[in-house]
């Protein structure tokens, strides 16, 4: 092991979500900073001397001035598409506006969706070790950390965020790689579908900044119906939503039609499994002796599980796919928006964590092999 004092520093935990990045120090209760995982670039010409400085905006500043900016998410479906932008966002995490610390002084725990391309992990390691010079790095699966946050060692985590939905069965602390299910239908797809439905209802949102308005409408107005056919037949009460310019928008059936996409991806012509099937199939791919326990220990995680009525709808759908006499129990922790980060904070504060990470020295000797050896 190299100079122990730096390695003994408090690790930095970064939950690198497709939609929101959460960052803070291990041992904290909640992440210190959460901001949308996008960069904004001005799309107009500066004509005044006192104009807003800078060619790239990240974090609260990008949110504040988003009307002037073209907004781009460097991550799509849990995979980084633009490494330059991703690097700028990570730089910002360490900057004086955020963690106010030097990257070379703290080990890092970074999260990743399961079944991601291994190239994604290799490139992330390369950026952290070679650009940020971190002393040590560990890349962990999001769902496992969510289970840590609930204090359990057995359960199946259904994690649905902005880019990826996945179900990971874990038994007595062992994850079962062959049972993991993942689909790339998540919150951002719901937002896109909502934008389409709102266009049909007469509201047009076309710029990247207006897409963020659609996301906010989704978070405030959408809900999951327990019986969508019945709700289609009834007259849905419209909810009035005030847009940033002061005008109002009446949101009708789009309120429950948009999140319906999570359970019926074929609404947009996608052939993926619905969320309930992802969960049930993950359990069915596990050993027969474990299934009963897993059905009674379902844990929800991620922002897309926060829709009103989500738990009830999931329960009614999973009941149809489970054996008759099996008891199904779904727990939805209140802090599930952050549970991956909280789990990371717990894991990175444990003494055993020091045995898990890849040190800079190991990385220099073995390269990306060291990363694959220590992540699963």
UniProtKB/Swiss-Prot annotation:
Sites bearing 3'-nitrotyrosine, chain numbering: 4
GO CC entries: centrosome; cytoplasm
Compartments where found: Cytoplasm, Cytoskeleton; Cytoplasm, Cytoskeleton, Microtubule organizing center, Centrosome
UniProt-recorded Gene Ontology molecular function terms: ATP binding
Pfam family, one: Actin
Keywords tagged on the record: Acetylation, ATP-binding, Cytoplasm, Cytoskeleton, Nitration, Nucleotide-binding
SMART domains, A to Z: ACTIN
UniProt xrefs under SUPFAM superfamilies: Actin-like ATPase domain (SSF53067)
UniProt keyword annotation of Calcium present: no
Modified positions (N-acetylmethionine) in chain numbering: 1
Protein role: Component of a multi-subunit complex involved in microtubule based vesicle motility. It is associated with the centrosome.
UniProt similarity note: Belongs to the actin family. ARP1 subfamily.
Protein name: Beta-centractin
Organism expressing this protein natively: Mus musculus (Mouse)
Gene: Actr1b
């Amino acid at each position: 092991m190299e100079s122990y004092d730096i390695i003994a520093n408090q690790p930095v935990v970064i939950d690198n979500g497709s939609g929101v990045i959460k960052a803070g120090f291990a041992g904290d209760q909640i992440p210190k900073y959460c901001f949308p995982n996008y960069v904004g670039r001005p799309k107009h010409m500066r004509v005044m001397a006192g104009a807003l400085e800078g060619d790239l905006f990240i974090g609260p500043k990008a949110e504040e001035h988003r009307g002037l900016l073209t907004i781009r998410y460097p991550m799509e479906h849990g995979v980084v598409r633009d490494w330059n932008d991703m690097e700028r966002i990570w730089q910002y995490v360490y900057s004086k506006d955020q963690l106010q610390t030097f990257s070379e002084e703290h080990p890092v725990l970074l999260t990743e969706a399961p079944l991601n391309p291994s190239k994604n992990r290799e490139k992330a390691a390369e950026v952290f070790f070679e650009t940020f010079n971190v002393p040590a790095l560990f890349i962990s699966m999001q769902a496992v950390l969510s289970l840590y946050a609930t204090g359990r060692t057995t359960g199946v985590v259904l994690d649905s965020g902005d880019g990826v939905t996945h179900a990971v069965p874990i038994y007595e602390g062992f994850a079962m790689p062959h049972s993991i299910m993942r689909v790339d239908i998540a919150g951002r797809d719901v937002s896109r579908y909502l934008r389409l439905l709102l266009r049909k209802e007469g509201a047009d949102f076309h710029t990247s900044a207006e897409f963020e308005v659609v996301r906010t409408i989704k978070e405030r107005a959408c809900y999951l119906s327990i019986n969508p056919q019945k709700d289609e037949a009834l007259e849905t009460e419209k909810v009035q939503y005030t847009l940033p310019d002061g005008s109002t928008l009446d949101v009708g059936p789009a309120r429950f039609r948009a999140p319906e996409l999570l359970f019926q991806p074929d609404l947009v012509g996608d052939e993926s499994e619905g969320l309930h099937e992802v969960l049930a199939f993950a359990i069915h791919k596990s050993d027969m002796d474990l299934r009963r326990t897993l059905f009674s220990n379902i844990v929800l995680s991620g922002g897309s599980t926060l829709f009103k009525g989500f738990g009830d709808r999931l329960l009614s759908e999973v009941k149809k796919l489970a054996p008759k006499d099996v008891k199904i129990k779904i727990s939805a922790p209140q802090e599930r928006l952050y549970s991956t980060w909280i789990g990371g904070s717990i894991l990175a504060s444990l003494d055993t964590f020091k045995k898990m990470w890849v040190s800079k020295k190991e990385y220099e000797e073995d390269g990306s092999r060291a990363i694959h050896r220590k992540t699963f």
